[in-house]
Regions:
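Short aromatic-acidic-glycine turn motif
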Residues: 294-308
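Short beta-strand elements of extracellular/lumenal beta-sandwich folds
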Residues: 260-285
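Surface-exposed beta-strand/loop patches in extracellular or lumenal glycoproteins
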Residues: 281-298
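Intrinsically disordered, low-complexity Pro/Gly/Ser/Thr-rich segments with frequent PxxP/GP/PP motifs
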Residues: 304-327
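Conserved, mostly hydrophobic/aromatic
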Residues: 28, 86, 188, 196, ...
Length: 327
């Protein structure tokens, strides 16, 4: 098998003009995480499944992009759904000193979480001090909750993911649990995805055989590296069975005409500007009223300054755009 891990960031994908590599892949693993983190002030989910209209980083966009659902719609324009894998994080990101939001969510903070809320941070300077990021294995966060009744799990029923909030310290951490794994399985089934990928395995949790009650030692908590989420994910995928095969693209055109159709454009995040050039090689006049149709993935909204008319028709994962010239 040939697979590739690919970005889910709209900022990166906006500059990608050639996806021809995809035809060689058996599976495409979408890294649908790190949508939000301590690199900016927006306190939002690390890996939301669906868009949330209250996401402060994307609220001004015509179409919210920082979620798995947008990444799926983008890559569905590249290859069949059964070749797409959903990325699932077994780690957290988070902030401290959070202001506003609902239990922190949609709040603001310029301070990534540190200390006990950041045991997987990077030691960038090699001095033993971890760069604040709120990065932790999931099992560590469960241990923190065992020792702190004010550290609580909340559920965002729009994005279909949980998060953790400590109201006294104003700390927010993204999270994953059995409920979000079930939501991801529902999404995989609904979209006919090929499965999932995980980053990173030692973030999953299980009961610790070396548990010492009351201990605050990282290795003596109630939970440690385990397989709780991975087992649930595996059982859910097995129960789901094989994917359906997507239908082949069909050409519904009438009699072909000897013309060239070239689409060129440029990208200025989050907008694309395209020019359509049609060159007539028939030696005869093409009379007014001709049409050009194409499928546009639902990761984008079509707007046009086209001099003729156009229509937009729902076509599953795509919108079929039909341009009609003037007389």
């Amino acid at each position: 098998l040939l697979t590739a891990a690919v970005t889910a960031s709209p900022c990166v994908l906006g500059g990608v003009s050639d996806n021809s590599y995809a035809k060689y892949l058996d599976f495409l693993s979408v890294m649908s995480y790190d949508y939000h983190g301590g690199w900016n002030e927006y306190v939002e989910h690390l890996a939301g499944i669906y868009p949330n209209a209250e996401d402060r980083e994307t609220v001004a966009q015509i179409m919210p992009t920082l979620c798995m659902d947008w990444a799926y719609r983008y890559y569905r324009g590249v290859l069949p759904s059964e070749k797409i894998l959903m990325g699932i994080p077994y780690y957290t990101r988070g902030w401290e000193n959070v202001q506003g939001g609902t239990n922190g969510l949609h709040g603001t903070s310029k301070t990534p979480a540190s200390g006990k809320y950041n045991i997987w941070g990077d030691d960038l300077d090699g001095d033993g001090n971890l760069e604040p990021a709120g990065a932790n294995p999931l099992w560590h966060v469960l241990n923190l909750m065992e020792n702190d009744p004010n550290l609580k799990v909340y559920w965002d029923d729009t994005s279909k993911v949980p998060y953790v909030w400590q109201n006294n310290e104003k700390v927010f951490l993204s999270f994953e649990n059995e409920k979000s794994i079930d939501a991801r399985l529902d999404y995989i089934k609904d979209k006919n995805l090929g499965g999932a990928l995980i980053w990173v395995m030692n973030g999953d949790y299980g009961l610790n055989p070396n548990y010492v009650e009351g201990s605050t030692d990282v290795n003596e908590g109630k939970y440690t590296f385990g397989d709780t989420l991975t087992k649930r994910l595996s059982e859910g995928l097995t129960k789901m069975g094989d994917c359906a095969k997507s239908p082949e693209d069909s050409n519904s055109s009438l009699e072909p005409i000897n013309v060239d159709v070239n689409l060129t454009g440029n990208y200025d995040h989050p907008n694309y500007t395209y020019s359509l050039n049609i060159t007539n090689h028939t030696g005869e006049e093409i009379k007014g009223g001709w049409t050009v149709s194409f499928d546009l993935p639902k990761s984008a909204v079509y707007k046009s300054s086209w001099g003729g008319t156009y229509s937009v028709k729902d076509n599953g994962d795509f919108n079929t755009i039909t341009l009609t010239s003037g007389a």
